[in-house]
């Protein structure tokens, strides 16, 4: 994607070793992604048990891969499709409301929480209850410049004030943001260097 000046939903990967893109969609992952929000798509290919107890293949990915389940999965695996087979229906491939929700610092509910019914659709938020074969997700324009800021304080109220100010008043939201408590920071200074190198 770099050659197109684009980025995927997450460029930081996951806090879980071995996590996958599909797994991220299944769990609506992306808690640190302030600007893009949790992984979400309405375009996916998956198998599930229907209300009659029968295993079925659901092709919501909007790519013409054939008619039968075997044909669809074979063409997907062997990449037997072209741009002409790809359709662009009026469906979401990201959470297009998240920025508005995360800026609402006075809301009664958090911007992101588990099992948010607003973002449960097909593979999105399925939490492993179906077998997902493929997903389509939006990409994002790569920023020309980025800057990382580390902010430390002994007063949690100071962080709350900074967070509210950024979300309410900044023209552009941060790409991502993460909290580390003191014990975590102190431990990282001494431990886990080998894990970092391996990953």
Descriptions of predicted regions:
Residues 1:
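Short active-site loop/helix that positions an aromatic residue
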Residues 4-7, 11-158:
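FAD-binding subdomain of flavoenzyme oxidoreductases
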Residues 7-11, 163-192:
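Flexible, glycine/charged-enriched surface loops at secondary-structure junctions
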Residues 16, 193-199:
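Short, intrinsically disordered, charge-balanced linker/junction segments flanking boundaries
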Residues 144-176, 197-199:
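A conserved active-site cap/scaffold subdomain adjacent to cofactor or substrate pockets
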């Amino acid at each position: 994607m770099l050659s197109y000046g684009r980025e995927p939903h997450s460029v930081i990967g996951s806090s879980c070793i071995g996590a996958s893109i599909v797994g991220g969609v299944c769990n609506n992952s992306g808690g640190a992604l302030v600007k893009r929000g949790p992984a979400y798509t309405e375009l996916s290919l998956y198998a599930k048990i229907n209300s009659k107890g029968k295993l079925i293949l659901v092709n919501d990915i909007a790519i013409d891969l054939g008619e039968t389940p075997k044909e669809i999965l074979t063409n997907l695996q062997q990449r037997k499709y072209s741009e002409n087979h790809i359709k662009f229906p009026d469906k979401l491939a990201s959470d297009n409301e998240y920025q508005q929700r995360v800026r609402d610092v006075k809301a009664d509910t958090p911007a992101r929480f588990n099992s948010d019914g607003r973002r449960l659709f097909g593979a999105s938020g399925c939490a492993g209850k179906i077998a997902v074969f493929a997903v389509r997700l939006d990409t994002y324009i790569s920023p020309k410049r980025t800057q990382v800021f580390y902010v430390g304080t002994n007063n949690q109220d100071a962080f709350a004030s900074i967070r509210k100010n950024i979300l309410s008043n900044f023209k552009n939201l941060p790409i991502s943001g993460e909290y580390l408590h003191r014990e975590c920071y102190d431990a990282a200074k001494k431990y886990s260097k080998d894990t970092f190198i391996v990953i």
